[in-house]
């Protein structure tokens, strides 16, 4: 299949620049994965499409305020550091701009010297290995000094950092939010559980690779970035029990989906596991465990449009996207939601 097969027309004004005032009152498009039939609802109505005995799987990763603005020691030149991946306690793989000022041995400071950094090495991809020096707890310093690393298509500042976190976020480590989860409130989750639907959590730390465009014409030649995931024994047991009893596994977000499909064996059973995944899901892939998917509207020609197409069909999904544009749905990270059932 060709990359062009996953393109669609999107007016720029439909790219949401800020979240919905109330998380669970955004719009929800419900798509039947077999027929492609579309219904228009609001997000809190998702409960009407969940059955007692189903299991909702959510990603509890928490976004690090990983964008740091500082100065080069000696010259005072302004620098931007974006933390990509933790190597050990105080060492991170980091994207540094402007790169020409970030040579090995160069020193930088943030917050008037509360946090200091030195470049230890430079990778083939231009990313820097950076060692940080500070007193206290790194995450607390990052909370004070760091900014949210918003996607490039969001140009407005966040009023509140928590707007880019799910209400159940717990494990620090993501460079971007698992955005399908942003629509849930604690009240809605309580109502879902009260209806007899189980909720379980896994962790996948979302990397910046999620925003990297596909650069090959033949989609089968594309290689995914790798991301760290974790599934507990308790969550695995609940998922397996749900399937044994005939319930559906409803994945919240493409990150939960990729984690479940990585861990599941050929019979669709999962077990406690952690590791790195670079699973690439596109049409032709046979889902092993995920029955339904709650997700946002994704970028044209992205691997995420391919992933949702694999659960339904390319024609069904692109038709749903066309209907979404015609009905002025809001797109991307802060946009409206889709439930493929």
Curated annotation (Swiss-Prot):
In Gene Ontology terms, what is one molecular function of this protein? S-adenosylmethionine:tRNA ribosyltransferase-isomerase activity
Q: What EC designation does it have?
A: 2.4.99.17
Q: What is its main location?
A: cytoplasm
The pathway entry for this protein reads as: tRNA modification; tRNA-queuosine biosynthesis
Arranged from A to Z, the UniProt key words for this protein are: Cytoplasm, Queuosine biosynthesis, S-adenosyl-L-methionine, Transferase
**Coiled-coil intervals, chain numbering:** none
Q: Which reaction does it catalyse?
A: 7-aminomethyl-7-carbaguanosine(34) in tRNA + S-adenosyl-L-methionine = epoxyqueuosine(34) in tRNA + adenine + L-methionine + 2 H(+)
Q: Which GO terms describe its biological process?
A: queuosine biosynthetic process; tRNA wobble guanine modification
Heme: present as a keyword of the record? no
| Source superkingdom | Bacteria
Spell out the subcellular localization from the entry: Cytoplasm
According to the UniProt record, one GO cellular component term is: cytoplasm
The record's listing under Gene3D superfamilies reads: QueA-like (3.40.1780.10)
Task: Please describe what this protein does.
Answer: Transfers and isomerizes the ribose moiety from AdoMet to the 7-aminomethyl group of 7-deazaguanine (preQ1-tRNA) to give epoxyqueuosine (oQ-tRNA).
Similarity-based family: Belongs to the QueA family.
Oligomer status and interactors: Monomer.
Matches recorded under PANTHER family: S-ADENOSYLMETHIONINE:TRNA RIBOSYLTRANSFERASE-ISOMERASE (PTHR30307:SF0)
Q: Which HAMAP family match?
A: QueA
Protein name as annotated: S-adenosylmethionine:tRNA ribosyltransferase-isomerase
Q: What organism does the UniProt record list as the source?
A: Clostridium acetobutylicum (strain ATCC 824 / DSM 792 / JCM 1419 / IAM 19013 / LMG 5710 / NBRC 13948 / NRRL B-527 / VKM B-1787 / 2291 / W)
């Amino acid at each position: 299949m060709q990359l062009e097969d996953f393109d669609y027309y999107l007016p720029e004004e439909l790219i949401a620049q800020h979240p919905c005032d109330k998380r669970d009152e955004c719009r929800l498009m419900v798509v039947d994965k077999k027929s492609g039939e579309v219904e228009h609802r609001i997000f809190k109505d998702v409960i009407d499409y969940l059955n007692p005995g189903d299991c909702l799987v959510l990603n509890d990763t928490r976004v690090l305020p990983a964008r740091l603005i500082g100065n080069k020691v000696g010259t005072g030149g302004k620098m931007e550091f974006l933390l990509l991946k933790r190597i050990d306690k105080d060492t991170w793989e980091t994207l540094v701009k402007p790169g020409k000022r970030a040579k090995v041995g160069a020193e930088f400071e943030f917050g008037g010297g509360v946090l200091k950094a030195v470049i230890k090495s430079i990778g083939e991809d231009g990313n820097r290995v950076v060692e940080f020096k500070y007193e206290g707890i790194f995450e607390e310093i990052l909370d004070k000094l760091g900014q949210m690393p918003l996607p490039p298509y969001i140009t407005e500042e966040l009023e509140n950092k928590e707007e880019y976190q799910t209400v159940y976020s717990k494990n620090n480590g993501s460079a971007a939010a698992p955005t399908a989860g942003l629509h849930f409130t604690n009240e809605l989750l309580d109502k879902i559980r009260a209806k007899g639907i189980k909720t379980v959590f896994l962790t996948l730390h979302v990397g910046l690779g999620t925003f990297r465009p596909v650069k090959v014409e033949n989609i089968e030649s594309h290689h995914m970035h790798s991301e760290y995931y974790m599934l507990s024994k308790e969550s695995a047991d609940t998922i397996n029990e749900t399937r044994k009893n005939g319930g559906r596994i409803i994945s919240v977000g493409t990150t939960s989906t990729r984690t479940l499909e990585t861990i599941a064996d050929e019979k669709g059973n999962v077990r406690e596991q952690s590791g790195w995944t670079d699973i690439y899901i596109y049409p032709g892939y046979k889902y092993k465990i995920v029955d339904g998917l709650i997700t946002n509207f994704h970028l044209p020609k992205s691997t995420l449009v391919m992933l949702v197409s694999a659960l339904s069909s390319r024609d069904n999904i692109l038709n749903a996207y066309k209907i979404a544009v015609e009905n002025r749905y809001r797109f991307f990270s802060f946009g409206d939601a889709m439930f493929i059932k």
